[in-house]
Structure formats: C-alpha cells, structure tokens
From Swiss-Prot:
ATP binds at residue 622. The lineage of its organism: Bacteria, Pseudomonadati, Pseudomonadota, Alphaproteobacteria, Rhodobacterales. A motif ('HIGH' region) lies at residues 41-51. This is Leucine--tRNA ligase. It is found in: Cytoplasm. InterPro entries: aa-tRNA-synth_I_CS, aa-tRNA-synth_Ia, Leu-tRNA-ligase, Leu_tRNA-synth_edit, M/V/L/I-tRNA-synth_anticd-bd, Methionyl/Leucyl_tRNA_Synth, Rossmann-like_a/b/a_fold, tRNAsynth_Ia_anticodon-bd. A motif ('KMSKS' region) lies at residues 619-623. It catalyses: tRNA(Leu) + L-leucine + ATP = L-leucyl-tRNA(Leu) + AMP + diphosphate. Pfam families: Anticodon_1, tRNA-synt_1, tRNA-synt_1_2, tRNA-synt_1g. The keyword Nucleotide-binding applies. PROSITE patterns: AA_TRNA_LIGASE_I (PS00178). Its EC number is 6.1.1.4. NCBIfam families: leuS_bact.
Length: 847
C-alpha cells in the first residue's frame, strides 16, 4: 500500500497546474465571468495564518466557480508603499525599494506552496513605476475634472513619522503606525473632493445587499448625514468684519435653552483674535496640540476661552450669549461655530458647569416637573417629550418632530435655513514622505500649479536618497526637486509631497483587469471583468479602504476609466474572522512578561522544564509571539492540512483558534482519505443492492457541499465531506459505485485540499486534472427521499420512531408499530384502543 506524502506530491501538482496554465484568466465572452479578490497584502516579509485563511477562502471560491463553468479572475499583488519601508531604511540602512522588493520575493515564495489558484501573470506592486505612473495619470484627469484641489488646512501631524495623517489614521489621538500623539499644524495640502459624493455614497449603501450590515452601518455613521438649521447670530462689540456669527445646529428646537456660543480655534474670528491678544494666542496654541479628529477632540479635556464678545439671540436681541473659543469644535464640520444648550448635550453640560453658565431645560420627560439637572437630558429623537421652552410644534412631540417644526418656524421668520450636512470631509492625500506615489504637479512662479505633461509620466522616485535625518528626502534632493515648467519652460520646483497609500489601494482592483495596459484601465477588459464579484478582507477596512474605493470608482467613471456599471466596484463583500492562538509567557525578575513561541512550548513547559503561563487565545501578534509560521505547518503536515484546518474549525466570519491538536486531526483525516482512495482504487467487488444507497449519498454530498461553498459556510461543506468519508468507508457497494463516489469526493474537496484531490482523482482514473474538471451536479431524482421517519406517540407521549418506505400502506405501518419494543412495553400485552397513522407525519397509539 502506498503512503501519502504531501511534501513529495504538492509541488508536483503545482508544477502541473502551471504547465497547463490552469489559473490564467481568460477573457471569454462565451462564458460567464467571475472575479474573486482578497485584499492584497502589505509586503512585511512574512505571511501568517491570517493570510492563509483569507487567501484560502478566496481560493475555494475561485476553484469552485472555475469548475462550475465561469471564466475566473483571481489575481494577487502588493500594497507596497508606506512608512515601514522608510523606517526600515532608517533603522537598518539600505533602501526602501530593496527592502520592499526583497519582502515581496519572500512572501511570494511563501504563498506559492499553498497551491492558490492565482493568475500570477497579473501580479504587480503599487511601488512599480508602471503602476504609480497610471495613478499619476488619473490624478491629472481628476484635477481636470475638478475632483482635486489644494488649500491650506489644519492637519494631523505625526511628529515621529513627520507626516500628515488623515483623521481615520488617528487612533486614540495617536498616529496609527508610530503611536505618537498627533498635533495640529497648518500646511498646504492636496485634497480629493470625496465630500461631493457624500449623499450618493450614503444612499448607494442600500444597494449593497451582499455586504455585511455592520460594514454598511459603519460607513453610514462615518458619512454622517444630519439635517439641521444654519443661521447667524448678530454680534455685539465685534471686530470689524465680524458682525455676524454663522452657526449650524442639528437641534434648533433647543434654541431657547442656549447659554453660550463657541467657535473653533481655527475659526476666522479666533484667528483674528489670536493675532491681537497674547492670551488668546496661548490658548489656541494649546488647542493645536490636540489632533483634528473627532475622536481626539472627544477624549481631550473640554476647555474654553471667553473672548469677551457677545452674540444676540435671534428671538430676543436683549438676550446676549458669551462667545468662547472651545477646543472641541471642528472648523471643517458645519460652520466651525455652535451654540451650546447644556441641558440637552452632555459635552455642553460639562462645559457650562465648568464655566458657571446657565442650564435651561427646553424639554422634559412626559409628566415630570422642572428640576435642577444632575446631567444632560438626551433622549432618543424618536422619544416623545414635553417642551417647556419650545417655540414650534406641539407641546408634547418627539425630538424629530420638534426639529422639523423648529426648522420650518425659523425659515418662516427669516432666521436661517434648513441644511443637510455630512460628517464626511474631503480626503487630504498629501504625505511628507519619500516612499509613496509622487504627486505629478510642478510649481512655477509664472504659471502657478501646473500638472506634469502626461508624456513625462511616470514621475519616478529618485533612487539616490538618504534617510540619515527625519523628514522627506525629496525636499533635500535638488536634482529631482528642481525642474522646468512644462507650460512655459522656466525654472520650477516639483511637488515633493507623495500620495497617501490609501490612494494606491483604492483602484488596484480595476488595474488587475488589464495590468499591462498603457492607460489606467483597458475599456474592453474593464467592461468584461468588472465588477469584483466577491471581495474578501477584514472588517478593520470598513471605513478607510472600502469607502475610499467606492469614491475612486466614481471618480474613475467620471474620468472615463471605468464603465458606469462599476460605480460600486464590489458586488459582494465578506469579512473573515481572525486566526487566534494561546499566549505563552514566563516572567523576569521584575515580574515583566517574557513571551514564547508556540513551537518552544510542549505540554505547558519550555525545553528546560520551566512552566509557562497560558493566556486564552487572542489575535496572533508578533510582539506576544503567539504566531504560527505557516511554512512550519506546510513542512510538517503539508499545505492541504493548513488549508483544511482554517476552513473547517469555525464559520468563516468568526475567529478560528489555531491548535496543534486541531492541525494534527486535520492531517489524520486527509491521510485517512488517501488510504480510503487507495483501497477503493484496488477494489473489485460486484455491483449490488447498496450501489443505489451510495449514489443517493453522493448526490446529497454534492448538493450540500455546493450549498456550503456558495453560501460561504465552508465549515459546513467540510463537515459534509467528513460525513461522506464515513459513508463511503462503511459502504458495501460494488467497486464501480465506490470508485464513482470517490472521484466525486475528489471533485468536492478540490477547492479546499487541491493537491490531495489531484492524487485521489488520478488514483481513481479521473481524466486530466481535477482542477480542470467540471463541478459535479446532483441528480435531482436521487435527492428525493423514498423513506420517511415517523414519530410514535403512545397516549400523547413520544415513545420512539420508525422509518418506512414513503408509499407503505397504513395497515403495514400498523404491523411494524405494534412490533416495536417500546410500544409493546407500553401496551403490557394488551391491545390498543386505537391506532392512528397520519401518512408522512406521525403514528398515535391510544391505550
């Protein structure tokens, strides 16, 4: 009997697939297409089990769709620009390009042994000049379409990475990569007009039926549509040019509870006061040490500076409110100015309490009297409340009704207008770093800002740069920076900012349709392959990458690079769970944790016998060393074992805990399948009565595995394959029936364990490669059960069940029921008073 040896067989089948060009995507108008894509990785240098799970999911889908007759596009590339490469250059010497391409080579070498059905001929990295040159061409097209602009802006500045961060890249007030506290700084920045699409991006979420509801909700909240009132306070004693203070509020129904007005430190009025008042300047400088994101402002201590200025209430000019500069007001949301109603906003309540300002309730819960508030009363807008200082609508109404009535009333009185605003702000893409896509514009003293001529693209990054000091090396590279104006030929200066790396990943899915085209996309190829039918990646990308990609698809459609049908680029989205592992640690003399790799721990002890603390499973982390190297698993068990385990142990949307015992169990099962196939390949039994039962079991396996794979219930598909293996091993059917079933088994398990499937397919005489075989179809007639299981009740209590042919006569069923041991015990030798057979449903025995 031969022995299953993954190390010897897996590479052989991978070579066979490559030689046959099995996974080369083919534009075939005669066949339906299917585009499956996993979010491409950053080339850190090592793949991890999370990568294995993610890419195996996509591979299962791609292989099954190809077998089902689709022309499949399943590409791979590298999200290759970014700070880690520059950091590596600074820490270790060398060049970011060498570090990046070296890591790509290492990761490709680790991924290929997994046997993924990837069309490697379409591979690219975003740091390839051929890729970012097309990105530069699109940037110029977007400039011409009015989707790009440049302005001075207060930005989040990372003082360690020395670059600007988008609000989404500020986590808990710190840079998402460096972890350094961000500060506010004013710089001239390039922006994409994503806010122009806010309403469309929000509304279109309802069309994404095959996206997780959680992702759609996260995007809706980030876009943040609100309906409110925009109006102007008149100012008392204001500096010249500031006689009105424009305010936006989502709660105009609380105007009669106003006790102060507040402006952003970046508001024009605050800027004016800053130039003329040292105390204001000091306060504003303090405010700028907090990031610009809402999250950073929310967590900072709320502080204000009384300017001494006053505004007049729009309904009572004798009623004046103090004007504060407040550190929690955003300049680029609304108008950068608000009025505070402390009774109905907790932030305003804390501010008013701190500065001794009045707190006047506007509404109360129904059937309550006005009393001093210990905290703000902030009911849901859908809740009915009693307005005691209302000015529009009913005395008792919901907050939603109160807001609508207040807007209508204010508009009728000439106090402002109803406005729809969005939380989503324009996307600042300027980054002060080297390892990114150069922004293709030139600054000329005569012509101003001029786009680079397209025939000069790509604007390549220079190789001869130094990272011996922080900051952007492009600023210190005169032969690259200094150039001539493409418009007038005069001396000019190249833009030294590079693009946010999220730009690179916002359109790569479109480039895969024609990765060698001389334009960003090829119209014919994009029309055939777009949209991505199935996109797979982590939910951590719900806002940044996925929202930016949706915007970019619209921008590409507007500039002629994508067809209208691709305005939503991803038809279906699946967000997979993580791969987790226990954490092993000991402690040093100071009690600090010292982490250990799983392979260094056996039965809870290190090699020297030292016991370890075991922390329950958590996300795999290099710092905590609870990582499993996929290459070790492949060397020990084979790629198919790794693939089988990450697919089998948990629903794919949930986390899966990697355990050595689980991997061993997966390996044992695959060895069992091999032995079963080897045994069946040598069987010679005659056809017999059990052949039909095995054919029916095979049909059920086809139906249920297909349903599991197509429904992303891979664990259920694998559970059915376990069951089918047991059925086949116990079957007494003849040799041909068993061989037929085993060949079907090879086809069904091919998406999950493709190497073993090829071995089994070849062993059982399958024609060609199973990777090129058509997906099996279940005979509908074999899916119809010809038996039925009937529960037996005696005096209303269930006593057992009986399985009988569906067409068995009631009289024959009665005989079998009366012969049942449980029924005989209940009867105690007596005859039943009544025996009722409800065909196909139940049998009732009355004693």
């Amino acid at each position: 009997m031969s022995r299953y040896d993954p190390a010897a067989t897996e590479s052989r089948w991978q070579a066979a697939w490559d030689a046959a060009g099995v996974f080369t995507a083919r534009h075939d108008p005669a066949r339906p297409k299917y585009y499956v894509l996993e979010m491409f990785p950053y080339p850190s240098g090592r793949i991890h089990m999370g990568h294995v799970r993610n890419y195996t999911m996509g591979d299962v889908v791609a292989r099954q769709k190809a077998a089902a007759g689709f022309s499949v596009l399943h590409p791979m590339g590298w999200d290759a620009f970014g700070m880690p490469a520059e950091n590596a250059a600074m820490e270790r010497g060398g060049h970011p390009k060498d570090w990046t391409y070296g890591n790509i080579a290492d990761m490709r070498a680790q991924m290929k042994p997994l046997g993924l059905s990837i069309d490697w001929s379409r591979e690219f990295a975003t740091c390839d000049p051929e890729y970012y040159g097309q990105q530069q061409a699109m940037f110029i097209d977007m400039m011409e379409a009015g989707l790009v602009y440049r302005k001075n802006a207060v930005v989040n500045w990372d003082p360690v990475d020395m670059t600007v961060l988008a609000n989404e890249q500020v986590i808990d007030g710190k840079g998402w990569r460096s972890g350094a506290p961000v500060v506010r700084r004013e710089l001239t920045q390039w922006f994409f007009r994503i806010s122009d699409y806010a309403g469309e991006l929000l509304e279109a979420l309802d069309t994404l039926k095959d996206w997780p509801e959680k992702v759609r909700l996260m995007q809706a909240n980030w876009i943040g549509q609100s309906r409110g009132l925009q109006f102007a306070f008149s100012m008392a004693g204001a500096p010249e040019g500031f006689d009105r203070l424009e305010v936006y509020t989502t709660r105009p129904d609380t105007l009669m509870g106003a006790s102060f007005a507040a402006i952003s430190p970046d508001h024009p009025l605050a800027r004016h006061l800053e130039r003329h008042d040292a105390e204001v300047a000091e306060f504003v400088a303090e405010c700028r040490r907090v990031g610009t994101s809402e999250e950073a402002l929310e967590k900072a201590e709320k502080k204000g500076f009384d300017t001494g200025l006053r505004v007049r209430h729009p309904f009572d000019t004798a009623w004046e409110l103090p004007v504060y500069i407040a550190n929690f007001i955003l300049m680029d949301y609304g108008t950068g100015a608000i009025f505070g109603c402390p009774a109905h906003d907790q932030r305003d309540f804390e501010f008013a309490t701190k500065y001794g300002l009045p707190i006047r309730p506007v509404f109360l819960p129904e059937d309550t009297e006005e009393t001093a508030l210990a905290e703000a009363f902030v009911p849901m807008k859908s809740e009915r409340v009693h307005y005691i200082r209302g000015f529009a609508g009913a005395e008792v109404q919901t907050g939603e009704e109160g807001v609508a009535a207040a807007i209508d009333f204010c508009e009728s009185q000439g106090v402002g207008r109803g406005v729809t605003n969005y939380r989503l702000r324009d996307w600042g893409i300027s980054r002060q770093r080297y390892w990114g896509c150069p922004i293709p514009v030139i600054h000329c003293e005569t012509c101003g800002v001029v786009p680079e001529a397209k025939e000069n693209l790509p604007v390549r990054l220079p190789d001869d740069v130094s990272f011996d000091v922080p900051g952007n090396p492009l600023d210190r590279h005169p032969t690259w920076r200094d150039c001539t104006c493409p418009k007038c030929g005069a001396k000019a200066r190249r833009e030294t900012d590079t693009m946010d790396t999220f730009v690179d990943s916002s359109w790569y899915y479109a480039r895969f349709t024609a990765p060698r085209a001389a334009t960003p996309t090829d119209a014919e190829e994009a029309d055939y392959w777009m949209n991505v039918d199935q996109y797979i990646g982590g939910i951590e990308h719900a806002i940044l990458h996925l929202l930016y990609s949706r915007f970019f698809a619209r921008a590409m459609q507007k500039t002629g690079h994508l067809p209208a049908k691709a305005i939503e680029p991803f038809n279906a989205l699946f967000t997979q769970g993580m791969v987790t592992h226990e954490i092993y640690l000991t402690r040093d003399a100071a009690g600090r944790p010292v982490y250990h790799l799983p392979e260094d721990v056996t039965d809870g002890r290190l090699a020297d016998g030292t016991p370890v603390e075991i922390i329950p499973s958590a996300k795999m982390s290099k710092s905590k060393k609870n990582v499993v190297d996929p290459m070790n698993i492949i060397r020990q068990f084979g790629a198919d074992t790794a693939r089988w385990f990450v697919m089998s142990d948990s629903p794919p949307e949930r986390d899966v805990e990697w355990t050595a015992s689980g991997a061993e169990a997966a390996s044992k099962h695959l060895h069992r399948v091999w032995r079963l196939a080897d045994e069946i390949s040598r069987a010679d039994g005659e056809a017999n009565a059990e052949d039909g039962a095995l054919d029916k079991a095979t049909a059920r396996a086809i139906a249920e595995v297909t349903q599991g794979v197509e429904g992303f219930a891979f664990n259920k598909a694998i559970a059915k394959l376990y069951e089918f293996t047991n059925t086949l091993s116990r079957s007494g059917a003849g040799a041909e029936a068993k061989k037929r079933a085993m060949r079907t088994m090879a086809q069904l398990m091919s998406p999950m364990v493709p190497h073993l499937a090829e071995e089994v397919w070849a062993m059982l005489g399958g024609e060609g490669l199973v990777a090129q075989a058509a997906w099996p179809k279940a005979d509908p007639a074999l899916l119809i059960d010809d038996t039925v299981t009937l529960p037996i009740q005696v005096n209303g209590k269930r006593r057992g069940e009986i399985t009988v042919p569906k067409e068995m006569a009631a009289s024959e069923v009665e005989k079998l029921v009366l012969a049942d041991e449980a029924v005989q015990r209940a009867l105690g030798g007596a005859a039943p008073k009544k025996l009722i057979v409800v065909p196909g449903r139940i049998v009732n025995v009355v004693i």
